């Protein structure tokens, strides 16, 4: 009988043991819990996300240069080659976004340089002098891997438009002034980029136009940096869609060029 009582008491103790232990005064015992990772909180790096490591400065010396189809679509006005709002300067955000997509930080000189040139009482031919101050100040304050002065060519559609695979693009041309000591660097840079663009979309670049002599600038502020380019982005007849497609090709080519250096 005593053995049976001991056995029953033993079973009772086994049953009560977890309850007794749970009531013992261990530090913060009542707050102990198992931390289970929440799968929804896990963040994975996207393979498409590229952290910017290169910097590009964008300038628009002739900021009022306009594209006829864009002006007509947005204002109803036809045959307009210059506009104070609907112009190449208004494309800067689109260009910055395409550079960003390629992992390149692009910064525009956020000044309407054509308006500034007029405010200073200067003629159209003096626009590069006006732009020079702003470009030089930026280069002095920050370091850029590339400086681009964007323009719109005055050439017509036949010269500035490419149709490839049923898709139309605005052609680009690179202008290099030969009347300064660093022009060989600018020329080499322009030729490399032109070649890369044509490898991506054959014929999209019209090549490099060399400028010197009378009635041309001959420098185009390219003496400020050996990594400075002047790019004619399409012509007066190119559409916004054509310019957008070309901007995607241009920024991809620039990304390849910067990565190779």
Question: Language-model segments: which ranges?
Answer:
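Solvent-exposed loop/turn segments at secondary-structure junctions
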Residues: 63-66, 112-116, 152-157, 179-182, ...
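Second-shell loop/turn segments in exported
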Residues: 77-86, 95, 117-126, 175-184, ...
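Active-site microenvironments of hydrolase-like enzyme catalytic domains
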Residues: 134-177
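Active-site-adjacent substrate-binding region
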Residues: 184-210
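Active-site-adjacent mobile loop/cap segments within catalytic or ligand-binding domains
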Residues: 208-261
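Active-site histidine-acidic residue metal-binding/catalytic motifs
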Residues: 51-122
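Hydrophobic membrane-insertion alpha-helices, especially the h-region
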Residues: 7-23
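N-terminal, intrinsically disordered, polar/charged segments of Gram-positive cell-envelope systems
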Residues: 18-57, 65-68, 76-79
């Amino acid at each position: 009988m005593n053995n049976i009582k001991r056995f029953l008491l033993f079973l009772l103790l086994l049953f009560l043991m977890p309850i007794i232990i749970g009531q013992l005064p261990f530090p913060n015992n009542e707050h102990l819990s198992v931390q289970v990772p929440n799968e929804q909180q896990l963040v994975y790096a996207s393979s498409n996300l590229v952290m910017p490591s290169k910097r590009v400065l964008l300038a628009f010396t002739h900021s009022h240069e306009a594209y006829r189809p864009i002006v007509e679509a947005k204002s109803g006005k036809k045959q307009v080659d210059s506009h104070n709002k609907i112009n190449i300067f208004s494309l800067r955000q689109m260009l910055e976004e395409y550079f960003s997509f390629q992992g390149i930080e692009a910064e525009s000189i956020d000044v309407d340089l054509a308006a500034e040139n007029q405010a200073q009482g200067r003629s159209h031919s003096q626009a590069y002098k006006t732009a020079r101050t702003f470009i030089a100040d930026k280069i002095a304050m920050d370091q850029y891997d590339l400086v681009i002065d964007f323009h719109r060519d005055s050439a017509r559609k036949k010269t500035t438009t490419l149709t490839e695979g049923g898709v139309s693009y605005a052609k680009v041309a690179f202008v290099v002034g030969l009347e300064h000591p660093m022009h060989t660097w600018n020329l080499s840079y322009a030729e490399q980029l032109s070649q890369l663009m044509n490898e991506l979309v054959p014929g999209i670049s019209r090549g490099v136009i060399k400028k010197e002599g009378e009635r041309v600038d001959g420098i185009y502020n390219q003496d400020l940096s050996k990594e400075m380019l002047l790019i004619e982005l399409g012509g007066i007849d190119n559409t916004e869609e054509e310019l957008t497609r070309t901007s995607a090709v241009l920024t991809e080519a620039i990304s390849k060029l910067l990565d190779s250096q």
